[in-house]
Amino acid sequence: MFLAAAVQMRSGNDRAANEARALELLGQAAGRGALLIGLPEMWEHIGPAREKHAFAGPVDGAQLARIREFCSKRAVWCLAGSIAELAQGPGGRSAEGSRIYNTTALISPRGEIVAAYRKLHLFDVDIPDGARYRESEQVAPGDAPPAAIETSLGVKIGLSVCYDLRFPELYRQIGADLLCVPAAFTAYTGKAHWEVLLRARAIENQAYVLAPAQVGRIGPANENRFAWEHACIVDPWGDVLADAGGEQEGIVVAPIHPARLSQVRRDLPALQHRRRDVL
């Protein structure tokens, strides 16, 4: 058994302030004994793409340096939410004005980036509450699904980002024991779907789900964009083990039992009953 923590934070367009707050919340989680701590989507910056280009770089560059240092010092695993990755072109250069990737990473207790994943599904939606989202105008989609990552925690971890949550085939293909969903889910869609989708992915895959989240307003004041909040952790039976609720920043912590995975999969062996010859 080990403890996992999901961070709930309110990111703005001041990257330095966001990083300081993220490290503070990571410290709180580690102080409570969490060995796996997840940051939300876009923890480092929420704002115009032109601002992201000022600091975006490769995933193993400066953006995650302090998070990696934290992991090494505190001997914890970290789901690094998502950052603005600027892909490198010929000669290590990036074309000016090129789109970024919305990239998550898993960092080991040695401070090593053991896996990274570029968000596949981009959120281009007009919300009935009046908010308009066109992620593809700023972000390029990834082109490869993530693989399950073996860890010293006794579970295989799978990576995804926010809107990926609506595509169940992605999680079935990963085949992980613990599914990570760092998010900035909208308040309008989150109220109806956030918990339902997280629980569904947990039940379908008989896996734990770790879902860090943004809280409050996301984006400029003149844009009607609010995050749903409710960072949470769900068990393989679909029970919500911890929920951060709304409005406030903070962390939630819950135990992850590898034995619980085995029990659920033994008692209801749905994964063994898949008709791979047909589907």
PLM segments and residue spans:
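Residue-level detector of high-confidence beta-strand sites
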Residues: 103, 115-119, 181, 243, ...
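A conserved C-terminal secondary-structure "cap"
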Residues: 260-279
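Active-site catalytic loop in hydrolytic enzyme cores
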Residues: 89-174, 187-196, 200, 267-270
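CN hydrolase (nitrilase-like) catalytic-core segments centered on the catalytic cysteine
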Residues: 59-79, 156, 161, 165-250
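Cys-nucleophile CN-hydrolase/nitrilase-fold catalytic domain and related Cys-dependent amidase chemistry
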Residues: 15, 23-110, 116-118, 125, ...
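Short beta-strand scaffold segments in enzyme catalytic cores
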Residues: 80-82, 102-106, 147-149, 231-233, ...
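Extreme N-terminal starter segment of soluble prokaryotic enzymes
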Residues: 1-5
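Short polar catalytic/cofactor-binding loops
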Residues: 8-14
